[in-house]
Amino acid sequence: MSMFNVHRKEITWGGRKLVLETGKVARQADGAVMVTYGETSVLCTVVGAKSQKPGIDFFPLTVNYQEKAFAAGKIPGGFFKREGRPSEKETLVSRLIDRPIRPLFADGFRNEVQVVCTVLSHDLENDPDIAALVGTSAALTISGLPFMGPVGAARVGYVDGAYVLNPLVGDLPKSELDLVVAGTVEGVLMVESEAKQLSEDVMLGAVMFGHREFQAVIQAIIDLAEECAKDPWDLPEPPAEVAVVTGKFNDAGVPAELAEAYKIIKKQDRYAAVGAVKKKALALLTEAAEIAVAGGILKHLEADVVRGNILKTGVRIDGRDTKTVRAIEVEVGVLPRAHGSALFTRGETQALVVATLGTGQDEQIIDQLAGEYREHFMLHYNFPPYSVGEAGRMGSPGRREIGHGKLAWRAMRPCLPAKESFPYTMRVVSEITESNGSSSMASVCGSSLALMDAGVPLPKPVAGIAMGLIKEGTDFAVLSDILGDEDHLGDMDFKVAGTVDGVTALQMDIKITSITEEIMKIALGQAKDGRIHILGEMNKGLDHARDSVSGNAPRITTISIPKEKIREVIGTGGKVIREICEQTGAKIDIDDDGTIKVASVDADAAQRAIDWIRGIVAEPELGVIYNGKVVKVVDFGAFVNFLGSRDGLVHISELARERVAKTADVVKQGDVVKVKVLGFDDRGKVKLSMKQVDQTTGEDISAQLEAERAASKRERHHED
């Protein structure tokens, strides 16, 4: 009899088998589910602390997604040969899992919860992210933790006008859409997508298609939970101090004072006024237990003020209605030495965005389970503490910065020129210099402007807008271009980026149990209106790409050579190509198909490198004169290097017009000479002549020599 009490559910989903199994691995975790989709397997575990840490006024949820190299039969690189810090993908998938599960934990639950998803097998066809999200939902559902799930998730593609459920990794490049949607039976909680300028209707259809298709997964999780779910945790009753403190605040008029403070339009002044009200409110309390619950109560009071005003009057914190976008100011070319730059300001949110162009040598090499590849477009988002008027830690980017940068990257990528027509590596850096909401979308707008300022031929400008939602019962209001407070106190963060023709990126996070198709449709339509308005403001600064790349950027010239000549251009151990780069100052990239990219800020340097390469691959032509260098002197002549790495022999009889006794009397190693191709011997070796070329002018004097010989011959004949 087995020592394991295994429970297993299996369904066919998207043409592949999905298996949920628990009871064999990681049995000491509160919940552990092994998910297998195709031959991709992910172990998802959940552990909750049995008690709440004192003084915690937030929900401490941590999600760690990790990919093990052995899952794809690989050994990690590097000196230590083991997995190290999380990769960008691991960070992004961790956020992808966190976002739909966080709002489903019971209000007031403050125990620490840790989710760990470990990729144990990867078939290189089914991306582990969907399996990890499904497994996390299943593990939480059976754990007994106060999780109001389960959650389902699916990836949606769009090929030839039809939606595709969970497209294979190899099929995604053919898809016009890569969308991940997660939600409950009732509605959608999270969307993350990249699209090739698709309409709002197509995007909404994809979301609802995914929602329908993952219902089978939710049912499988429910069936598993009915067999093996642990007893639900007992939630502690709200402390008695909550009612006491709420009463004290109401009696002291704190809600009314907060309402007055939130009428101040300027962010810093408003924060100061709100802070003063909170300080005054806390002074009413003397007991430690009362102070411990005061923060949460004040936040609820703030939310009631902000949300109530919007739903009742349609007027927001800064005086706008629900559809108005803040004032926009655009400047381009703000940094004199940068290849492209833009300062994008929208209200109190500002991004300084800089584009830099490089060569193939600057591409980022990314090593993933699916294999190594090179990325020629990078977008990095930085959020320094001064942008919100604070002093804080500076260091490597956090999860939020990585996620925001990737969202802007997704928004821009569908509109970038093909690598074949624009062979530059592009790096965009967005420095957030002021922030009051929608900084990631400001990064999209600034990136579009900076790239066009750098001369990157974008077919159309790209803009982004962040939408919000206030929902109470059946009443709701969709907000365009949300402020930071509207994000924190609202029910939705819905970001849409795209061109005048369609959507390129969409990200949605819901903080309530779910939203309906009706709300999403209104939000998408309102976002389109806002995006078109923003594009119009951007066009006032720059409406199309510069005619050429910046004068500070390298100029890349592409030439092609026969593949069999690549070895000659590179040389033994890279000797030849290194010499070309060192002598000319140009950068050279050689592809396996014989495509060569020569880059240099100095056009003359690039041309010298091109001429050198063409000389190497050119075949010597009979009767043509070339410049060369003597590389070896022997008794019977001199070997001369010409046409790059090609050598030929100048026989001693072809060194000079007069008779030569010793080769060294005429040339020495290192001499620069002019030679004419006389022909080729049986082995393909080149026969050269110096005497048939005027070494000063480079002119062909063979006719003159022939005439002299003929005259000399006639003279001898006459004498005879």
UniProtKB/Swiss-Prot annotation:
It holds the Pfam family PNPase. GO terms for biological process: mRNA catabolic process; RNA processing. This is Polyribonucleotide nucleotidyltransferase. Its main location: cytoplasm. GO terms for molecular function: 3'-5'-RNA exonuclease activity; magnesium ion binding; polyribonucleotide nucleotidyltransferase activity; RNA binding. Its cofactor is Mg(2+). Belongs to the polyribonucleotide nucleotidyltransferase family. It catalyses: RNA(n+1) + phosphate = RNA(n) + a ribonucleoside 5'-diphosphate. Involved in mRNA degradation. Catalyzes the phosphorolysis of single-stranded polyribonucleotides processively in the 3'- to 5'-direction. Residues 554-613 form the KH domain. Residues 706-720 have a biased composition (Basic and acidic residues). Mg(2+) binds at residues 487, 493. The gene is pnp. SUPFAM superfamilies: Eukaryotic type KH-domain (KH-domain type I), Nucleic acid-binding proteins, Ribonuclease PH domain 2-like, Ribosomal protein S5 domain 2-like. It comes from the Bacteria. It is found in: Cytoplasm. InterPro entries: ExoRNase_PH_dom1, ExoRNase_PH_dom2, ExoRNase_PH_dom2_sf, KH_dom, KH_dom_type_1, KH_dom_type_1_sf, NA-bd_OB-fold, PNPase. Its EC number is 2.7.7.8.
